[in-house]
């Protein structure tokens, strides 16, 4: 390819955002795992305002007990608890704090995983022992 020509663009579906993946997981869980309470920990909340305002907001959240790196979803059922860190399928980065927190949770005997799709979340919850009422259609 001559140096002055632009590179050809790859075609394909856009990569879903982390929020889109998480919402799809929650929709699946309402059908397949209705007896599981799933709570979102807003550690990755989008803060507004200037850098100073965001710094103050983050300080307030930490003062209220927010832990840096805590997983996105806490899943609770009658006989168990599991934690999911949600990432987009491609171009996602797991921070050192997130890895450390997942390691800490699993060292306490709880199930924790990074999930990048509805399929991964379903398989993880099922393997963790969450009561499942429906499998995913193939």
Regions found by a protein language model. Give the residues of each.
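Catalytic phosphate/metal-binding cores of nucleic-acid and nucleotide-processing enzymes, i.e., regions
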Residues: 1-138
């Amino acid at each position: 390819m001559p140096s002055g020509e632009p590179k050809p663009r790859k075609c394909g579906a856009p990569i879903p955002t982390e929020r889109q993946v998480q919402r799809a997981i929650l929709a699946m869980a309402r059908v397949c795992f209705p007896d599981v309470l799933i709570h979102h920990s807003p550690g990755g909340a989008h803060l507004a305002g200037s850098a100073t305002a965001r710094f103050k907001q983050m300080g307030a959240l930490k003062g209220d007990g927010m832990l840096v790196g805590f997983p996105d979803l806490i899943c609770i059922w009658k006989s168990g608890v599991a934690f999911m860190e949600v990432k987009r399928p491609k171009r996602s980065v797991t921070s050192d704090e997130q890895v450390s927190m997942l390691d800490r949770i699993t060292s306490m005997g709880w199930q924790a995983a990074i999930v990048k799709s509805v399929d991964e979340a379903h398989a993880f919850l099922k393997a963790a022992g969450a009561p499942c009422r429906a499998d995913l259609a193939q």
